[in-house]
Amino acid sequence: MAQLRKPSQSLVLSESVDPTTVDPFVSVRTEEVVPAGCITLWEYRDSCGDVPGPLSHGDLRRLRTPDGVCKCQVHFELPTVLKSGSTGTVPEHPAVLAAFIGRPRRCSLEQRTKELDSRFLQLVHGGLPARPSYMIARPPRPVRGLCSSRNGSLAQFGQGYCYLSAIVDSARWRVARTTGWCVRVADYLRLLQWVGRRSFGSFQIEKSAVDHVYHVVVDAEYQSEQDGALFYQAILGLAEKDPLARIGGRLNPLAAEFAPGSALRVEPVTPQVTRRKGSTRMTGRDPTIVSVGKVGMAITSIQDALVATELRNVNFGRRDTEAECRRLWARYEVNDYFRRHKAELLKFDARLRSRMAKKPASSRARPSDAKIQCIGWRDRHLLPQRLAGLSKQGRSLVWSRFATSNIRRKTPPCVVNPSADPVVHNWKDSAALAVKKIAEARRRQEIRAAAYAERAKARGQTNVVASISEAIETTLRRNKTRFALDGLHLAASAIVTTRLRSWNQEEIRAGREFRKSTTSWIWRHVPSSIQDALNLTSVRDKLDPGRAFGYVQAAVAQGMSDFRRAKRALAIVAKPVIRNIRDPYEHGFVKRDGKLRHSRDAFNKKLRTKAVAATKVHKIKF
């Protein structure tokens, strides 16, 4: 993987600018490892021997590393991406995903983020702002665009990042990624000028057990406008006293932050009183429940997520996918829709049904899939009326006169009428001869069928086969691909239908709520909690035809042509995962078996047969 060769110092730090800064590569081993493929800066440093501290800003700017060494100091974005994480869940985070797909990307940041990081480094080291950031309410204009919209709270950074408390929260992530966990005083002073906070509380700078390493303790109780300026003065004093100082405690690898279980934990959120829960009980950390095949599995840490994923990959066959699709669709779409528009829909459905009932049977029957034409001896009568548009000549080549006339219902040109005269006998063939004749006719028939099928296929007709066995094979093969996502279609088409039906009445009144139940909502929706993000991710994976798990992608696109099948599907909705205390505003709820049920009083019990339940709309007495 990596070859050893003699060190070339030019690779490492081109020039130490001033002698006071310790060159972190003083004691580089005699061989130095040149990585093949992408490695992280830390692995690169370790391969260079025992390097004292972490690299700081100045180093990063001067550092010349071989290609493929990633310079980020923090290689992934924590799940703080979501403003309110539900307690202790693990989102599908690029690093985690990469790890369990088995293609670990060492650095899961996007290229764009890395570019902005390097621009930030250049800016901070290039010059000084007109007014230092610690004097004004928000960071100076040039940096403002580089601050993320997302705030990093200190709880999300482990030890060694205490210096971030004096830095604007919107810049913390970028600073952590470019600066690492122990910042040099010289670099820190520049950072304070560009992205320092004006008021953060009273502070104290403590010397730690290790030489030249200091720790900042901040007490946020008493904040004033002068905090930033005072802190800057203090750090300036420290820089004069000890030019080699670094700020940020020493990292202890045994600390809780480094246990893989809690590495990507999200800080707990302050609970809010909601109408649903009614009280604020903080139950501690609830694990995320993830379905692995038929089993639910509790996930509290990255480790668990990896294990669950492994399991899921092992037994995640077609049926699971199908069930999962059905569940997710129903959960996301149909349920929402029903909860809001149920009375309307049921009225509508009743009206539609009564209209259907008046129509002739042919239009009431559900459309069936096109039959595969199997041109066999016994089912000659199934042949299509015009033999797939062959010319008369072509037809007479393929079919015996008998077959053609049979299909056409014409009198055949030459036929012996059995005579009425009892003396003229039609002697029956002997059994053996009959068998021979039939066999011969069948053989000829097979040859013709093969020729016909071949020609039809060449003309691009897809559903013609030459023999029964081929028909069976084709059917099996098609079913394997075609019906993999059948549950998904059912749900999708139910949604399409409901949407088409209630469009006119509902759209105006329902406004945003209506739009929420459309499919595009799934794509535009910004997750509000990590769990939500998880659900969305998996729903999107199921929906995105490009990502369908090796199943026919065309099948997903059937959508609109499909909505005719959804007539009964409407009344059946998968059971929601969480059963909440009954909400007086929602009509009815969903029984165990997924049929909708309207109200539970004894008066309605006798009405609850299938037909009535689907057509009757009960008044709700408050």
From Swiss-Prot:
It comes from the Viruses. The record marks 248-249 as: Cleavage. Coiled coil: none annotated. One of its GO terms (biological process) is symbiont-mediated suppression of host innate immune response. Changing residue 233 to K: No effect on autocatalytic cleavage of p29. Reduces autocatalytic cleavage of p29. GO terms for molecular function: cysteine-type endopeptidase activity. This is Polyprotein p69.
